[in-house]
Amino acid sequence: MTNDEAHTARMGQRTLNVGFIALTAAIGGLLLGFDATVISGVVPFIREYFALNGAGGDLRLGWAVSSLGWGALAGNAFAGVLSDRLGRRKVLLCAATLFVLSASLASLATTLTAFVAARIVGGLAVGAAILIAPVYIAEIAPAQRRGGLVSLNQLMIVIGISASFFSNYFLLDVGEHNWRWMLGVQVFPALLYLLLLSLIPESPRWLVLKGRDPAALEVLTRVYGAEQAQASLQQIRQSLAARKLAHGWRALFDRRIRFVMLIALALAFFQQITGINAIFYYLPTIFAQAGGGVSDAFRQAVIVGLVNVVMTVVAIWLIDRLGRKPLLAIGVAGMAVSLLTIAWAFSVAPHDPALVGVAPANARLVLIAIIGFVASFAISLGPVMWVLLAEIFPNEYRGVAISAAGFWNALVSASVTFVFPWELSTLGAAGVFLVYGLFASAALLFVLLFVRETKGRTLEELEGELLSRPKSTAA
């Protein structure tokens, strides 16, 4: 008996609730959202503690902030392949362990090197969780609920983001070690994640890929019921019957997935090049640039976090009703308008390279436009991109292909957040947000021309439709 079959047997005959399974997997999203954006509150304090002012200070600060992203690159590079070999659940267990380790070490760091190393460890967990959690959910969810359940992962990410803004705000006045508490509090939800992962099964599609059909049928039966389980198992078998399991990175060069691979890479690029993580990671700094005190900047970050949560809930409600492509088009258009508005608001204010208040009269417009940008992102590129990535690739390519797209996504994110302090002090906020707005405009054009609708179709049905470039992209 394999470890996965033994785990399935230990779970007994109780019925498994697919909502509970998806929610458990999505806690990884909460942890990565918290871990990624908690740095926004830490920035002002580590800048002073690690003496990141003066010559080269902006780039060293960028390195400290983006180190999580560089770690995520390694997590992205290996998570998909490891999940194809070891299983989706085992990779999520590893990610949970790394979240605990990273939070502990970062909160105790006394040097910049130790801090960066701890954040890189957290990046490994982020890179794994952001890829494998939605894949796992997509592979266990019924087709009619898949979009909403996969989007649950994005909801947990934004709840984690909002929780980090709340946590930072409430820990702001605990004393000189407030930034250590901001980082260390994540240990508790990470330990809970480890516990809950022991209660859920392995992905049935992965079990079939490994020839473990009885274990897959056991999981499908307790999730879907006996009748639907047999039909689902047959669909999975048929999708794999005539194909050899793809191994390693060479699978990415298969001509059959070239078109969907290009779509995935483009969406991953646009999600980050439009500046979402730069905004989240430096949100109090941006609000301070628009005018206002430290406490006000942290309070405004909380407001943005709440808007992010609310609009992600709206996206989850709409994604299986309105569809993936309409949400993308509407949201990306809103992102472009909001970013260009932010650029204009800063353009009429005097530029201050020292990152101090510049134009209190524009602070309200900047806040409104950032809220508009985050709301638009939350109904489009935030959740919808990951849903599409979990849907458009064939079973035997899914792990490695999503890993490649995630690696590219993390590379762009890390690069954007690394250079942001330097850009802000060199180009000014107006120039930075103008560039982001132009990229968002290009993203809108791409969505309208190339993205296909996947709503309501099983993963196996989508394979035949998307393996080669479609004649029309209007659907």
PLM-predicted stretches and their roles:
Residues M1-A215, V219-T221, A241-A475:
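Alpha-helical transmembrane bundle of multi-pass membrane proteins
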Residues A229-L240:
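Short, well-structured alpha-helical segments
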